[in-house]
UniProtKB/Swiss-Prot annotation:
Organism of this sequence: Pyrobaculum calidifontis (strain DSM 21063 / JCM 11548 / VA1)
Disulfide bridge positions per record: none
UniProt cross-references to InterPro entries, sorted A to Z: Nict_dMeBzImd_PRibTrfase, Nict_dMeBzImd_PRibTrfase_arc, Nict_dMeBzImd_PRibTrfase_sf
Homology family: Belongs to the UPF0284 family.
Name assigned to this protein: UPF0284 protein Pcal_1534
GO terms, molecular function: nicotinate-nucleotide-dimethylbenzimidazole phosphoribosyltransferase activity
Length: 336
């Protein structure tokens, strides 16, 4: 099947789980993780951050995967979808009427009214996007691999310790403890909607709902991301979606991550159409890009989908990414 994207939608949101020290490196500090989704999409659309004059990086200075998505999928129209971000981006976006996610250890992730609104509006948006054909859906939500684990466990899947991390050192014990604390507080919720309300975040149900709408309109939904997309696919399935119509695209770094189990999770949920971008940054002249080969970042902002598409077009992805990397660091150093 030809999976050339007609449009690339990036769904953003936040969860207070990202404020737990050590849970994520998708931001230079825990507090800055609430800015990461806004900065990601501002950079993706404009080539520079707007809300803060800071390119989103890990604590080790490795830049956002939005750099890769922007560099290699430059010719694909982009759409920002706000599912519930604490910091709203200063670029145009579609608002699904959700709310930022809470700390699932302390209380519900969101109100069920907000989750229902996300499902309704997301599905409506998906039906419109589906008329275009192939729709790639990426995400930006620091802490999302932890809430993804919670969603999957809440829906009855064995996801313990199987979701990935933006860090080379996956904090699996900490993530599992957060999920255990959330389950102790909420008990196993009785239905999928309650699972999302109690244990999730705004992004995963939004991804699922948009994908469902795309499929209903005759389009092809492509979840472009890592282990978090197992949770989105599980919600899609629980909403009545046909998994035969759903595709998932990710990076080689996610598939090869020994601290997680991307392929196993996809198989357990029932996703059959899995595609992997085989790009390597091992020969890059830049340490920040070679770090990807050591397990840094791995996915995010639809990077796997962008790489998969670019490689299918025969593009020299490393050359494109290095050129964008050079431009970004000139901007960082000179403010130009």
């Amino acid at each position: 099947m030809n999976l050339k994207p007609a449009i690339f939608a990036v769904v953003i949101g936040t969860t207070d789980v990202s404020l737990i020290p050590g849970i994520t490196v998708a931001g230079a500090t825990p507090e800055l993780t609430h800015y990461t989704p806004a900065l990601d999409v501002e950079y993706l659309l404009t080539g520079r951050p707007i809300t803060l004059d800071v390119v989103p990086v890990t604590p080790d200075g490795i830049p956002t995967p939005a750099l890769v998505t922007r560099a290699v999928a430059f010719d694909v129209p982009k759409l920002v979808v706000n599912a519930g971000a604490r910091v709203r981006p200063r670029v145009p976006y579609v608002d699904l009427g959700g709310e930022p996610g809470g700390d699932i250890r302390r209380g519900p992730a969101m109100s069920c009214a907000a989750a229902e609104e996300l499902a309704s509006r997301g599905r409506m948006l998906g039906r419109e996007l589906g008329r275009l054909g192939v729709v790639y859906l990426g995400e930006s939500i620091p802490g999302g691999t932890t809430t993804a684990m919670a969603i999957l466990v809440g829906l009855g899947y064995n996801a313990w310790g199987r979701t990935s991390s933006a860090s080379p050192n996956n904090p699996k014990e900490l993530k599992a403890q957060v999920v255990m604390d959330a389950l102790e507080r909420a008990k196993p919720p009785p239905d999928p909607l309650r699972v999302v309300c109690e244990l999730g975040d705004p992004v995963h149900p939004a991804l699922a709902a948009i994908a469902l709408g795309v499929a209903e309109a005759g389009g092809v939904p492509v979840l472009a991301g890592g282990t978090q997309m197992a949770a989105a696919a599980a919600i899609y399935k629980a909403m009545g979606g046909d998994l035969a119509k759903l595709h998932v695209v990710t990076t080689r770094w996610i598939v090869e991550d020994k601290s997680a189990d991307f392929l196993g999770l996809m198989a357990e949920v029932g996703v059959k159409n899995v595609h992997v971008a085989t790009a390597s940054f091992g020969e890059s002249k830049y340490e920040g890009l070679r770090a990807y080969e050591r397990g840094a970042v791995k996915e995010g902002v639809g990077m796997g989908g962008a790489l998969f598409y670019a490689q299918s077009m025969g593009r020299d992805v490393l050359k494109l990414v290095e050129a964008e990397y050079e431009r970004v660091w000139r901007y960082v150093k000179r403010g130009d």
